[in-house]
Amino acid sequence: MSNGTIVQCIGAVVDIQFPRDSMPKVYDALKLEDAADSFAEAGLTFEVQQQLGDGVVRTIALGSSDGLRRGMKVSNTGKPISVPVGHGTLGRIMDVLGRPIDEAGPVETDELRAIHQKAPKFDELSPSVELLETGIKVIDLICPFAKGGKVGLFGGAGVGKTVNMMELINNIAKQHSGLSVFAGVGERTREGNDFYHEMKDSNVLDKVAMVFGQMNEPPGNRLRVALTGLTMAERFRDEGRDILFFVDNIYRYTLAGTEVSALLGRMPSAVGYQPTLAEEMGRLQERITSTKVGSITSIQAVYVPADDLTDPSPATTFLHLDSTVVLSRDIAALGIYPAVDPLDSTSRQLDPLVVGEEHYSVARAVQQTLQKYKELRDIIAILGMDELSPDDKLAVARARKIQRFLSQPFHVAEVFTGSPGKYVSLKDTIAGFKAIVNGEYDHLPEQAFYMVGGIEEVLEKAKKLQ
C-alpha cells in the first residue's frame, strides 16, 4: 500500500500527506513505520477521519502522540481497524486494537473483523418481550429488563452506577449460561482490575471478553473502544448466541468524541459537545440490537454531568433505551441503596400485556404511594405529621416502609457492608410489595424493612427489634 509522511501534529490529531492518487479512505487504519530514533510508540495506529484534499488526510492517533514529528513515515493498511473476534477472545483483556494487555500471550483466533460495521437491516431485527430477572427488587418491580433489550443506568458522580452494574453482572452473567462482553470506556483502571478479579473468583472468566480503554488513554482509544467491544459481541450474536454487553461508561465515549471534534476543527454545538453527537451515538446504539439469529442484551452506565438529566449527552442516550434506571443523589443521601429513583425510572416492559396484570398494578400502586408521600413532604416539613388526616398518615407510613423495602444488600458490596448479598425472585418481590401496599404489615416498624431481601426477612427482623 502507499506510504505518507506526517505534516502536522496537534495533540491526538495528526495530518499525514500521501501521493494524490493514493489517498487513504475515511476510517482506514494507518501505521507508523519507523520510530526507532524517537520515543514515539512503535507501530502507532492512526485512523483517518477527514480527507483535506491535496493528498492530506486528518487522522486520530490511537495511542500516545508523544515523540511524533513532521517527516516521519506512515504506511496505509488499506482497511479499517480490525480486531480479533470469536472464542479466542474469551477470558482475555484487550485494548482498543484487540491487543492483549493481560500478559497471557497472544489472542488465539484467526478471525479478524473491522470495527466499523453497518447496523442490521430493519427486516433482520427481532423485538423481544421476554423478561430478564435481575434479583434486584426495585429494578424487577419498577423498570423490568427485556431479554435482548437496552438498559441505561443514569446517575451523577458517586451514586453507585458501577456498583449497580457489578451487581447486575454478578446476578445475570453468573446465572446466565451465555457469554458476556465488557467494554470499559474511559473509566478507572482500578474498576477494570476489580471486575477482572470478580469474574475470576466466581469462575466465569472463560465466558467473558474484556476490552478496556481507560481514563488515562488518549481520546482516540476512548472513542473507539466501545466499537471494539461491540464488534466482538456482534460476532457471538451472529453465530446464534444470546450475549450480554456491558458498557461502562457511555458518557466517556461522548466526551472522547468532544475532545477529538474540537481538534478536528468542527464547530461545537450546545454545551461544547460535538455537532455530530446524535449521529455518533446513533451509529453505536443502532448496532447494539437483537436479530432473528441471536440477541444482545446491553447494560450501559451513563454518567450525568452535574446531575442534570437534560444535558445533551444523557438526553441523547435516553432515546435509544428500553429501560432507564435513574440513580438519585437524594435517595443515596437517605442511605437507601441501590439509590434507584422509583418515580423517575421507566421501562417499556412495564405493560400489563408483557409483565401481567398483577405485576403492573402492584408497581403502579407503589409509585402512587411514593408520589403521594413526595407531595405531602412539604406539608410535613412545615406543619409536622400531626396535621395530616388519618388517611394521609397511613399513606406516609406505608410509603416510608416501601422506600426502605426498596433497599437491598448487594453481593458485590459484602466486603464493605459486612452483610451478605440477597437475590430476590420476581415472584417474592411482587408478593412483598403487594402485601405492604394492602396494609398487611402496617403494624411492623419501618426499620424492619431496611436492607433486607424478601418479606420473610422483614418478619424475622421485626421480631428481633421487638
Curated annotation (Swiss-Prot):
InterPro entries tied to this protein: AAA+_ATPase, ATP-synt_VA_C, ATP_synth_F1_bsu, ATPase_a/bsu_AS, ATPase_alpha/beta_chains, ATPase_F1/V1/A1_a/bsu_N, ATPase_F1/V1/A1_a/bsu_N_sf, ATPase_F1/V1/A1_a/bsu_nucl-bd
Domain of life from the UniProt record: Bacteria
Catalysed reaction, written as an equation: ATP + H2O + 4 H(+)(in) = ADP + phosphate + 5 H(+)(out)
Membrane topology annotation: Peripheral membrane protein
Keywords: ATP synthesis, ATP-binding, Cell inner membrane, Cell membrane, CF(1), Hydrogen ion transport, Ion transport, Membrane, Nucleotide-binding, Translocase, Transport
Record GO cellular component, one term: proton-transporting ATP synthase complex
Claim: Cytoplasm is one of the keywords in the record: no
Principal location: membrane
Binding positions (ATP): 155-162
Molecular function in Gene Ontology: ATP binding; ATP hydrolysis activity; proton-transporting ATP synthase activity, rotational mechanism
Function in brief: Produces ATP from ADP in the presence of a proton gradient across the membrane. The catalytic sites are hosted primarily by the beta subunits.
Assembly notes: F-type ATPases have 2 components, CF(1) - the catalytic core - and CF(0) - the membrane proton channel. CF(1) has five subunits: alpha(3), beta(3), gamma(1), delta(1), epsilon(1). CF(0) has three main subunits: a(1), b(2) and c(9-12). The alpha and beta chains form an alternating ring which encloses part of the gamma chain. CF(1) is attached to CF(0) by a central stalk formed by the gamma and epsilon chains, while a peripheral stalk is formed by the delta and b chains.
Record PANTHER family: ATP SYNTHASE, ATP SYNTHASE SUBUNIT BETA, MITOCHONDRIAL
Similarity comment text for this entry: Belongs to the ATPase alpha/beta chains family.
Name of the featured protein: ATP synthase subunit beta
Gene: atpD
